[in-house]
């Protein structure tokens, strides 16, 4: 079981566990600082955010999660969504219409 703040180590790398509820309860993202990457599932997409119309989804919670957990990462961090093209934190800060 993983929780926000946990660090998963493998080899010489590590993933920091971030809690990003909103798309669904208990949603997690995984930040790999050594390669400046974050794996976000369906929380954030290039120019969009995840759906919140499923059971347990919350638009307000998702926006809060993205702003507090993801947009605070370094701008050059590459965002790898669950599907679709990759993007960067900086690009989403500047151009994602759902975050303004």
Residue ranges of predicted features:
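Catalytic core of the metallo-beta-lactamase
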Residues: 1-72, 88, 100
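Short helix/loop segments within enzyme catalytic domains
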Residues: 83
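Catalytic cores of DNA base-excision repair glycosylases
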Residues: 71, 76-79
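C-terminal domain-tail junction helix/linker
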Residues: 92-94
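Residue-level marker for buried hydrophobic side chains located in beta-strands
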Residues: 39, 79-80
